[in-house]
Regions:
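Alpha-helical interaction segments
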Residues: 9, 63, 143-144
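Sec/Tat signal peptide C-region and signal peptidase I cleavage site
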Residues: 16-20
Length: 251
């Protein structure tokens, strides 16, 4: 359950049409499924929304585990973010999370230099079982395209998949309240997927997260994004130690 909520966040992640100054508001809902052998059960749900606030975009993702899953690992995550309309560049990112016995609050404020540099002023506050475990301000630096865990979802949907060949890779820097990582998108071609009662033609994309020295920081995840003008991620999938988790759009 935790991994798929993080997968939704890490896509990573909605934009209808190609983004521009007149991007309409939208709300997209997902169910989080746990699959292991014959077990196929809904473990949670998530809602991600976008609003045009005039000078910028505001987005929010809310993810919850289902009551039966709460017995094993409770997830109550809320992500908030604001983005410049020009290039979907993030301005502010915030994650409020209750995961198991921990409560976390991460923030990132983005500053852009004239030379293409990006500075992230980050804070991370962690409380476990009522005890303060971390209160860590830090500053992260990057060059070129840089996103957070929420704006990456929109960035992905605006990539020119229709111009890519199978096997093409493109990377972007991603800041969280904890660290800097590289998020690499690998294009796997066009596939058809069945979600609920609908069949979609999709771009299949694999996501890879790496840290310093190219070391993997989490397992790969896969997403299927419609080839139409909406570019909707209709299915996301990640592996667990036992079974796998799948996020499906509610249509």
């Amino acid at each position: 359950m935790k991994k798929l909520i993080l997968a939704i966040i890490g896509l990573v992640v909605p934009a209808a049409l190609c983004f521009g100054s007149s991007q309409p508001s939208e709300t997209v809902r997902y169910r989080v499924m746990y699959k292991w052998g014959l077990i196929n059960k809904q473990a949670g749900h998530a809602v991600i929304s976008l609003r045009d606030d005039g000078s910028h975009y505001t987005s929010q993702l809310v993810g919850h585990s289902e009551p039966w899953a709460d017995k094993f690992f409770t997830v109550r995550d809320t992500l908030n973010g604001t983005m410049h309309k020009d290039g979907l560049r993030p301005i502010f990112y915030e994650k409020k999370a209750h995961e198991g016995s921990e409560d976390k609050h991460d923030t990132v404020r983005f500053i852009y230099g004239d030379n293409g540099s990006v500075t992230g002023h980050c804070t991370r506050h962690v409380v476990k079982k009522g005890e303060l475990k971390a209160n860590q301000p830090q500053t992260l630096y990057a060059e070129g395209p840089t996103v957070d865990m929420l704006s990456s979802y929109y960035y992905m949907r605006n990539l020119p998949f229709n111009k890519w060949q199978k096997g093409h890779k493109e990377s972007v820097t991603i800041f969280s309240g904890k660290r800097k990582e590289t998020l690499t998108f690998e294009y796997n071609g066009i596939e058809f997927v069945q979600v609920g009662k609908k069949r979609y033609q999709c771009y299949h994309v694999t996501f890879k997260f790496t840290g310093d020295g190219g070391k993997k920081t989490s397992d790969n995840m896969d997403a299927w994004i419609t080839t139409d003008s909406r570019r909707l991620p209709v299915q996301l999938e990640g592996k667990l130690v036992v079974g796998k988790v799948k996020c499906e759009i509610i249509n």
